[in-house]
Amino acid sequence: MKIIRSRRFTAERPWGALDIANMRGIATRLHWTDQPYRWHINDGEEVFAVLDGRVEMRYRESGVEHSTVLETGDVFYASPGTEHVAHPLGEARILVVESAGSV
């Protein structure tokens, strides 16, 4: 059992993570960042929940780029094959649930 105060978590580098759980190959990680990630496509599904801060999520569908701002409490679901990149607007803390070892 553990309690994690996500707003207190800060990593040593952007996108640094605290591994919370690995449940039958599904990883749950808390990330801290103040810098954009990179465009990528995950091996499978990804759940991206903003716990603190704001994040501009850019994604491509049928080659067309879209963008939306995720506020604290918002969740982005990336289905397999969804190309996306997260750009925090200041500091952000994000809970990511995905296949262990995914990009």
Regions found by a protein language model. Give the residues of each.
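His/acidic/aromatic-lined binding-pocket segments of jelly-roll/cupin-type domains
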Residues: 38-41, 45-50, 67-68, 86
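A cytosolic small-molecule/anion-sensing beta-strand core signal
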Residues: 51-52, 71-72, 90
